[in-house]
């Protein structure tokens, strides 16, 4: 039994060395980029800004901000390394300055999945501050496959300031919303009016910006609706006027007419009861749905968006340090 355990440890050490990760006397595993390759990089678009450092044989460390969302930080693993629990976060001087004292920043939760460590905007800003000051960041926790084996992930500050400046420029060009936030939207109307109130314009302006920026948008489906008050024929005509008014708002601001599919339904598809004033207010609406098709060779992740399946039926929109 003792020989079997010793053999397992020797095999584990051989495998780790073959993978190119360091193993100390207690099989401490350290993942870090080689010094000559430990540069920070930026992927920039109007949809998302990504500041990241590739980590050899581990994955990557990422500062990400999608359009319309706060910034966050995460570690992405190629293969699972950390056990669930809490990792220690420490700051230390970089390799080329020699060994120095480590300063603890606290603990961070570790969860299962491709992103075992995730940090919100406030915590990610603290990490950025340490990297700008030329400090190394160290995440330390036990391995999921052996409790006695520590796993460490090291982030280097090399070329961070230059990349962060580029990242900030990207942030200034982000759209106000992302696809998930805008692809199903609803504009409401007052009483029997065929025109929406001015307070609905910001939503439509955000939608227009998105449609004009996304080359893979194929259709914007516009559906007009009314409440149950009045004659059905009158309501059908009113829903048509509302849908066309919204369509005109889009086309006069640059959305190509050929992208629009305009439909109207009168009172046929209520989303709430017409017996109350609140319900009727919800039913007086025009819904907009953005359909898009992106070739498989392209990735929504690179644009910072998540894929969504759409149907033809009219629908209402719905640190830690």
Where are the regions that the model predicts?
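Extracytoplasmic/secreted proteins, especially bacterial periplasmic and envelope-associated proteins
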Residues: 126, 199-206, 237, 241-245
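Second-shell loop/turn segments in exported
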Residues: 116-118, 188-197, 232-236
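Periplasmic OmpA-like peptidoglycan-binding domain that tethers envelope proteins to the cell wall
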Residues: 226-321
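Periplasmic peptidoglycan-binding/tethering modules of Gram-negative envelope proteins
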Residues: 136-218, 292-321
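N-terminal targeting leaders that direct proteins to extracytoplasmic destinations
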Residues: 26-177
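Bacterial N-terminal signal peptides that target proteins for export
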Residues: 2-15
